[in-house]
Structure formats: structure tokens, C-alpha cells
Curated annotation (Swiss-Prot):
S-adenosyl-L-methionine binds at residues 9, 85, 88, 113-114, 164, 222, 247. It comes from the Eukaryota. Its main location: cytoplasm. SUPFAM superfamilies: Tetrapyrrole methylase. This is Diphthine methyl ester synthase.
Amino acid sequence: MLYFIGLGLSYETDITVRGLNAIKQCSRVYLEHYTSILMTASLEELEEFYGKKVTLADRELVESGAEELLRDADKEDVAFLVVGDVFGATTHTDLVLRAKQRNIPVEVIHNASVMNAVGSCGLQLYNFGQTISMVFFTDSWRPDSWYDKIWENRKIGLHTLVLLDIKVKEQSIENMARGRLIYEPPRYMSIAQCCEQLLEIEETRGTEAYTPDTPCVAISRLGSASQTFKAGTIKELAEYDSGEPLHSLVILGRQTHELEIEYLLEFCDDREKFKQDVASDQEYFKPPAWVPPPEDED
């Protein structure tokens, strides 16, 4: 059996009882270590809590070396651990399909992730649209396909969850080209850098899917004892020190409910200004009034 087990957001104890019991019966345990990190638990703490050796599975092992993960999983129990929920990345779906193609039994054990815990900032989950990822820009690569998704969400009044990039055990382009197994230090995108990149692409596109004055919520270390929320405009959050990782951002939709706004006021420096920013943003994206069709005189 190949178990896919979600670990939750922060602590070794966030795992479900069912997930922990599954780990204890596995002969091999892998921890996916490149789409997210468990913020407050080290590898050693996980191994002590599980009573099992845990092998870190980086991008290369999961995407290129799946043979190692799937080895003998049709004969013995193997666990693949994922921070948050199991299906937070398409890579995990691909791994499930590979296992099923080999007739390896698969069991999925879910857990909390940023996709549902984001509601703790006060925004209602059913008011969210498409989620996007913001990657680190480079001198030669500044992708902006996510811009269209924000535009689509905002046109129909929905919030946009922005997942901020992390780089763990990544190689530079030069080292990859030279075949050198030298890895860059870990990097975690800050709220300020995300907002700067948002503003850069808006200036390039110029269709005003959002503006510097669009209201947002900065989310830091979600699910931990030190989690924080900060409400402000993109321009304001581009100067915000969000502290230690991990971080996410929510761009508000124009249909923000009054209860959502009331909740967000707890995280503002200037409540009256934030209410005005929200009102202005909602007015900008307000659809034209409905005009009934002319009656047929016949």
C-alpha cells in the first residue's frame, strides 16, 4: 500500500490519528520537501514523534526518481508525507496515477491546508475564486499568466488566494548547465516582494485587474502560534515586513461581505481608510445597472 498522508500546517502533532497509525505500520517513510515546509517541526522531531526514519524527498526524487518511491509498494506499506493536504500540488496527483498504473494500492489521508485554513483571516471560503502561485522573478523569466486569473476572479467579485514561492534545494541555471550538484540556499518569498511583482506586472499589462490601492490581506505563518494577518492595499503591503515564512496573500474581490470587512478591520492600521479603499474598489468593479429590454409593442 502507498499511503499519501497530509501533515497539516505547522506542528508534528497536527497529523491525524489515522495518518499517524498508517505511518507506524510503514516500512519506508518519505517527506515531500519542496512545495512546502512544516514550519515548527524539524526532521528529527518528526522522526522522534513517528518512531520512524523519515527520508526527505526533494523535487528530483519525486519528479524524476519516482521509481524509488514506488519500489515494492505493492508488497509493503510505504508512506509519502505532504505538508498541508495531499493534493496541494499537481506532482502528487501524478504520483498517485503512476502508482495506480502499476496496480499499487493507494490510500489518501487528508489534513488541513492553506486552501481551507485561509478562512481564519475572516474571509468566507465560498467567496474565493481561482488560486494562483507567485514565483520568484529572474532577469530572464517574469511569468504573468496568473494575471488573467486575478482578472477573471475580480470580474465576478471573488477573492484570489496567492501562494508565495519557496525555493528549497534548487540549483542555479549555471550549475544546472554545468551538471554541478551545487544547491542554492533556501529562499522564501516575502509579502513585500510578492506585492512588488504584482505592481510590476500591472504596470506592464495596464488593464487594471487591480491597482496599487486594491485591498489585500497578508497572511504569515498560518496555523502556527505566531500566525499574523495584515490588511492593507497592495502599495502599503509592498513595504510591509512580514517576518519569518511562510506567507500567502489574498486579493479581495468586489463582493466582499460586510462581515468580512468587519473582521478584517482588526488587522488594519487605519480602519477608516481601509473601509474607504474597499468601497472604492467595489465601486470600480461594480457591474453596470441592469436595463430591461424594450417591450415588444406588438
